Structure formats: structure tokens, C-alpha cells
Amino acid sequence: DIVFADKIILYEGDTERMLIKSVLQSAEFESLRNQYVSFVQVGGAYGYNYRSIIDFLRIKSVIITDLDYDKDVLTESEILSSCSTNSTINQFAASIISDPCPTVQTLYEWKQRSNPIVINETICLAFQGREDGFARTLEEAMLAKRYGITAVEKKNQNVWKKHRKEDGLKFVIPRDGESDIHSIVSHTARAKTDFMYSVILSNLAEAMLPNYIKE
């Protein structure tokens, strides 16, 4: 499938696939839709393994993966000083910027310099940036974009319930106190496909498309 493709999109999970295939139906991506695109699902630890064959075939590709920093951090400063646990990101960082364990701050700066990160004119490495609201996953980036907040800004239950009802989205709101997007997504972990279905059925896929994927 890869050998005969015009382009390759490598992604992590079902929610990425659902979102990408939905937004590709829009007029903005007509030229890409009219090409033969190979969709390859790879876990965050395995995307780097495709580098050699992509370089050999010289097919323009994008690896869409998650920043995956420490999920227990509570502030923006803690996020910036934490490290990604994503093996694909770390292996590319070791190869390209000589840093096998980059902090989030280092990764943000790498993205800003490269805008976007392109390796050997064939592979675009796409993961959440600062403009995605300090998100560590796809779902966090989508909610951050929709509601114009960062992943660590807290809102009370009534605000989240209002957002959920008005947009027709399916996500779990923690019962106790105020919650941030980290907590919302963590509590929705077992229903991520339901969340993505609700985004698509509410015609919000384009509006919630994160910057790191759109670029």
C-alpha cells in the first residue's frame, strides 16, 4: 500500500483516523483527497521505524503523533520542563537535534524554528505545539482550540456542562470541584471514539482541527 501511494499519513489511533478522514472531505483538502493516500496506523513507539522505507521511496509523508509529556504536571512551567515519553519524537530528536530526551520547551522551539518539522524533504513530524494550548494529546488539543483555553486552565462543572450541551459533545466531567482539559480527557479515556463521533456528528471536525494537524 505504501509503495504505490502518492502520500502517506501515519497516525496513532482510531480517533486520529476518524478526524482525518472527516476533514479530508472538506473543499480545503480537495487536492489531497484526489491523490492516493495511504493511511497507516502506528503506535507512538513505532512511527520512527518507517523512516528508512519512506526515505528510500521518497514519498511525502506525515507522522501525526502525541507529545505525551508527564500527565501529572499541573502548571505551564512544569509542562515546559517535562520530557516527552513518545519514542518516535525522541528518536527523531536524537537524530536531528542531538537530544534523545528533549523537554517540551526544546520541542516547542524545534517546531518554531522549522515550522513545520520536515526531515529529508519527505517526512513531516507533527505533534502538539504551544499554540495547541499546551495539550499532550489529540483530544486535549481539540478541546483547547474549541474553548480557547489551555489544557491546564480550570473551569467549574456548570461551565463544562454548558459547553457539552451547546456543542453536543460527549465527554466525561469529573464530579469534584473545578476541572481542566487534562482531567476531562483522562476521565473520557475509555470513550474517546464516542467523543470523536460526537465531534463529527455535530459538524465540528474542521472547527476543532488542531493546528499541528492542519499545518
Language-model features and meaning:
Residues 1-10, 14-215:
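Acidic, Mg2+-coordinating catalytic modules of nucleic-acid enzymes
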